[in-house]
Amino acid sequence: MAQITASMVKELREKTGAGMMDCKKVLSEADGNIEKAVELLREKGLAGAEKKAGRLASEGIVETYIHGGKIASLVEINSETDFVAKNEEFKNFAKDIAMQVVASNPKYVSREEVPAEEVEKEKEVLIHQALNENDGKNIPEDKAKMIAEKKVEGRINKFYSQICLLEQPFIKDPNKTVEQLLTDLIAKIGENIKIRRFARFEVGEGLEKKNEDFAEEVKKQMGQ
């Protein structure tokens, strides 16, 4: 299989306007063949999705989800037109995102919203963990640090996938992320759609209480 480089992904994005992860995926499927990758993106309806994402989305809806009267979410999903905001697929997407917030408890919509100090703090923890893993392996200090930093590059993505809504595995189909679900909807509907913000509420949150995993209940319910 051909090695997929950053320059290949960049070239495909410039040709099609598709998202970075989608470009990387189809390049792998096309074994590095740019033209074949372009065809695959068009077949999947993903070409041009990112260009649509640059347009202003100021209409939309606020959706709610309440689980057993104990845990709830509010999400604002924006579209370019009121017509799309009334579309059943758009409304179903909003409902799915409201349930996703309840079940997976993200803190931010995207990694761009995560405060730099929070990221640095997490990186410090991960570096210490990685260095501890090298203890007793008789590795020179400078090389041990280099190995630790490489490990952190991969592990920080897992950190983002836990706290950022767009990077979380979609609760109904863990093989795709919420961002991929959103990109698919943009391509299908033909308008820019944004998950603007959300709020999550849980009875007794912040208070001492018995351990009840409502989020796990929601996941089980959505998997049925």
Swiss-Prot record:
It comes from the Bacteria. Associates with the EF-Tu.GDP complex and induces the exchange of GDP to GTP. It remains bound to the aminoacyl-tRNA.EF-Tu.GTP complex up to the GTP hydrolysis stage on the ribosome. The keyword Secreted does not apply. The keyword Cytoplasm applies. It is found in: Cytoplasm. Keywords: Cytoplasm, Elongation factor, Protein biosynthesis. Belongs to the EF-Ts family. The lineage of its organism: Bacteria, Bacillati, Bacillota, Tissierellia, Tissierellales. This is Elongation factor Ts. Its main location: cytoplasm. Residues 81-84 are annotated as: Involved in Mg(2+) ion dislocation from EF-Tu. GO terms for cellular component: cytoplasm. One of its GO terms (molecular function) is translation elongation factor activity. InterPro entries: EF-Ts_dimer_sf (IPR036402), Transl_elong_EFTs/EF1B (IPR001816), Transl_elong_EFTs/EF1B_dimer (IPR014039), Transl_elong_Ts_CS (IPR018101), UBA-like_sf (IPR009060).
